[in-house]
Amino acid sequence: MTIRIAINGFGRIGRSVLRALYESGRRAEITVVAINELASAEGMAHLLKYDSSHGRFSWDVRQECDQLYVGDDCIRLLHQAEIQALPWRELGVDIVLDCSGVYGSREDGEAHLAAGAKKVLFSHPGTADLDATVVFGVNHQQLEREHRIVSNASCTTNCIIPVIKLLDDAFGIENGTVTTIHSSMNDQPVIDAYHHDLRRTRAASQSIIPVDTKLSAGITRIFPQFVDRFEAISVRVPTINVTAIDLSVSVRKAVNVNEINALLQKSAHESFRGIVDYTELPLVSADFNHDPHSAIVDGTQTRVSGQHLIKTLVWCDNEWGFANRMLDTTRAMAACGF
C-alpha cells in the first residue's frame, strides 16, 4: 500500500524531503499528495528546482496555479496559516510530515489529527509529551500502532546518538561533552539585524557564533540513563550546509584508537549500514554535502587520552541526511498500521 503524505512547511527540510523521496526511488512506497506553505506557489516551485546547497533538481518541475508537478506527479499546493483549516481528511492523508519548524507540541499534533491526518511526524524534537521521539536505526523498532504523534528528533541528535550507542555498548560511557559546529541557519541575518539573542544579531557570514542548543536534552530523551551526564554547546560557522560534531566521552574500559575505529568502521558496514558511514580520507565539510547518512565518522580525527577519554569527529549533512531519516521513519510509522 502506498503511504499518502502531506508536507507542512516547505523550507530547507520540507524541500529536502521531497527531493530525497524522488532521488532515492521511493515513489512506489510514498506519495506526496499536498504541500502547505505560506509562500507563493511560484516561489515554492523555483526553490525546489534550484538549490544553492544541493544543486538543480534532476526531475522536471513545473507549477500551474496551485498545483506542483514533479515529473508526471501532481501535488496540491495549500497556503493555510491554521492547521485546523487543512483538508487532510478530504485528501486522504496518512501521515503529515510537519517540517514547519513552528509546530511541535502535542496540541499541534492533535490539530493535524483533527484535520483528518492519521499520524504526524515532526521534523524537530517537539515537546516531551509526544507519543515517541525516534532516532531511526537506534530506537525506531519501539514504534507502535498507537504512536500517532511522533518526533524525528533533530539532525544533530540523529548524527550523534548512533555513535554514542556504539561507544557505550562497547566501552561503557561515564559522561561526555558535545560541541556542534553547525552551518548557518535561516534565523541568522545576512547583515547585522535585531534578534532577541544578541549573538544572532550579527552577520552570519562574518563570525563564528555561539548559540544555545538543546542537544544534551535530545541525548537524554533517547538515553535517559545519561541525565546530568552529558553537556553540549554549539557554534554556527559561515558555511551554508554540513555540520561537524566533536564528541568527547569518558569510558570505563581502557581503549585505544585502533579499537575505536575498528568498532565504528565495522558498524558502518553491518549494524548501522545506511545510517552511519566511516572514512579515513582527508575530506572537508563540502565533501559531505548531499550525503544521506545520519553520521559519517572521521577516523583520522579519533583520539584517546589516558586510555579512558575518547574524542571523535562526526560529520553530517544536516539537511539531506535528516530528510532521508524522515522518510525512513515515515515508512516505519506506516508499517505499524493506522
Swiss-Prot record:
The active site is at residue 155. The record marks 182 as: Activates thiol group during catalysis. Keywords: Cytoplasm, NAD, Oxidoreductase, Pyridoxine biosynthesis. One of its GO terms (molecular function) is NAD binding. Pfam families: Gp_dh_C, Gp_dh_N. It is found in: Cytoplasm. It catalyses: D-erythrose 4-phosphate + NAD(+) + H2O = 4-phospho-D-erythronate + NADH + 2 H(+). NAD(+) binds at residues 12-13, 318. Its EC number is 1.2.1.72. The keyword Transmembrane helix does not apply. One of its GO terms (cellular component) is cytoplasm. One of its GO terms (biological process) is pyridoxine biosynthetic process. Coiled coil: none annotated. Belongs to the glyceraldehyde-3-phosphate dehydrogenase family. Epd subfamily. Catalyzes the NAD-dependent conversion of D-erythrose 4-phosphate to 4-phosphoerythronate. Homotetramer. PANTHER family: GLYCERALDEHYDE-3-PHOSPHATE DEHYDROGENASE 2 (PTHR43148). This is D-erythrose-4-phosphate dehydrogenase.
